[in-house]
C-alpha cells in the first residue's frame, strides 16, 4: 500500500482529451495552505501552464492544489492558450473548493493545439464528485501519455520532531533530456517547512535526479516538477538536522522516479549508469557524460548488447570536456576496457558480453584531470522508439 502524506485528497476524470476510455485529468488537493515549490523547463518555448505556474509561484510560494491533464500540451498556443489555462484554474478551483490562484496547472501531450474547453467544462464536475474517492495511483495513471506504467515512490521519514511522509509521482518516457523534458512530477509532503527551504530542497533533488537523465536528447516545452508541503503532520522541519533529513528523502524519491523514467523509456531495454569522474570540475564531468548518454551510436550499441567501447571514447572526445586522452580510464561493468590511450589486451568482447546483456549497464570513465564527478542515467535507442514517435499523432 502506498504511503500517502496526511491532508491530501485525489480526484481523476475522463475528459476525453485523447481517448474516451481513460482518465486524463487529475487533481490533488491539500486540506490547508501548503508551501509550494517548482522547477521548470529551460526550453525558450514554454507552455502556457509553465508560464502560469511560474507567475503564481512568483507572487506567493503557497498553493492548495495541483492540476494535470494529459493529451494536450497547451504549448505554442499564444494568448488564447494562456487565457484557456487560466480558465482551467477557475474550473479546478471550483471542483476543489479553493481559490483559483491556489491551483498550479500542468499539461502534457501534443504541442500546438488549443485546449478543448468544452471537455474541460464537462469534466470539472466529475473531478468534484470524485475528490477523495481516487488514489495517488489513479492520478499517476491519469498523467501518463506514452508511459507503459505509472511511476510512484514514497517513504516515511523520522525527523527529530516525529514522522513525516513524502510521496512522489511522475510521468515521462520520451523527449527526456536535461531539465525534466516531457516530464511532469509531483512531490507531496506533510512536514511543516518554510517555502524558501522547500524550494531549495526541490531544486537540490531535481539537480541530482530529473536533471541527470536522458532518453533521446530532446527537451520539452512543458517540463514541470511541483512540490507541496502542507504541515498536516504537525511535525516541524525548520531546524538544520530536519531539513537535511527531509532533503535526503526527497532526493531519494526523485532519484527513484528518474530511474523509472529511463527504465520506461519509449521502446527502451537498457538503463546505462554513466559516471564521469576525475574531470576538472563537475560541469566538465556533466558535459562529458551527456555527450556519451545522448550519442545515438552509444545508445544503439547498448540496444544490440554490443561492447563497442570505441563509440564511448569517441563521444567523450567530442564532448568539449578538457582532458588528456592518454590519461583516460574506461571500465564497463567493472571490467577495465581502456587506459593509457589503448584498449585492454584481454578478449573484451567475451569479457563484456554478460554485462552488456543486463538491463543496467555501468559505464565509468576517469579523466584523471581533477575532482569533478557526474552520473547520468541514459536509455538505449531501439526500433520501438522510432515506431512510437513516428505514430504519435496518428
Predicted ranges, named:
Residues 1-90, 94-394:
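A structural signal for small-residue-enriched, beta-sheet-centric alpha/beta enzyme cores
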